[in-house]
């Protein structure tokens, strides 16, 4: 009788299992991709069409946002190493799967309400609108990356430590972290424009 051999699961960075991660926010669950891959590098396959970045692994989207600063521009291997080291720090501090911490951070850092400018006879009037789920995810990842950059640029704190602290604080909903503070600010402005 032959034994069935199941294919080994592909773990992110050969360590983290994405299948055990649950996304608690149902609004963004469709746009946070958790397909398993060893190295989060899609080689630009998902950038040619408009909404295909929803199919990109959320970790790779974070890596791509970290590459946008002038120090890390185009250095994907450096950004991958930063995220891998930050995930190790997150796991040491929280004893949780860091991908789940990242998903919670994205859910807590994305603004639910924003403002747009409407022009009435030469006068700009702010109007509050609900944020689309894909924009929530994009904005959250961008705010997390901006918070990491502001916490580590021209400072002695390593980038991996800054990313780990930002992810943990955003996952807990701490208003002292950059991304959640910016989300609160945007929602406060939107609330005043209702």
Curated annotation (Swiss-Prot):
Protein keywords: Ribonucleoprotein, Ribosomal protein, RNA-binding, rRNA-binding
A matching Pfam family: Ribosomal_S7
Cysteine-cysteine disulfides: none
Gene3D superfamilies reported for this sequence: Ribosomal protein S7 domain
Record PROSITE patterns: RIBOSOMAL_S7 (PS00052)
Domain of life, per lineage: Archaea
GO CC terms, sorted: small ribosomal subunit
GO biological process entries: translation
Parts of the chain that traverse the membrane: none
Gene Ontology MF term list: rRNA binding; structural constituent of ribosome
PANTHER family, sorted: RIBOSOMAL PROTEIN S7
Family, per entry: Belongs to the universal ribosomal protein uS7 family.
Chain's role: One of the primary rRNA binding proteins, it binds directly to 16S rRNA where it nucleates assembly of the head domain of the 30S subunit. Is located at the subunit interface close to the decoding center.
HAMAP family: Ribosomal_uS7_A
Assembly mode: Part of the 30S ribosomal subunit.
Protein name: Small ribosomal subunit protein uS7
Organism this protein belongs to: Methanospirillum hungatei JF-1 (strain ATCC 27890 / DSM 864 / NBRC 100397 / JF-1)
Gene that encodes it: rps7
């Amino acid at each position: 009788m032959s034994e069935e051999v199941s294919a080994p699961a592909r773990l992110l960075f050969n360590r983290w299992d994405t299948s055990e991660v649950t996304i608690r926010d149902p609004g963004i669950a469709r746009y946070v991709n958790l397909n398993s891959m060893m190295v989060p590098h899609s080689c630009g396959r998902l950038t040619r069409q408009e909404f295909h970045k929803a199919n990109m692994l959320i970790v790779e989207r974070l890596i791509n946002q970290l590459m946008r600063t002038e120090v890390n521009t185009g250095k994907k291997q450096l950004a991958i190493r930063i995220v891998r080291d930050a995930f190790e720090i997150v796991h040491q501090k929280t004893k949780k799967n860091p991908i789940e911490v990242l998903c919670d951070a994205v859910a807590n850092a994305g603004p639910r309400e924003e403002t747009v400018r409407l022009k009435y006879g030469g006068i700009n009037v702010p109007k509050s609108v609900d944020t689309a789920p894909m924009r929530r995810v994009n904005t959250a990842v961008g705010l997390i990356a901006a918070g990491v950059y502001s916490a580590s640029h021209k400072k002695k704190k390593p980038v991996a430590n800054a990313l780990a602290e930002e992810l943990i604080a955003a996952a807990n909903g701490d208003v002292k972290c950059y991304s959640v503070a910016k989300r609160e600010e945007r929602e406060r402005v939107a609330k005043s424009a209702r």
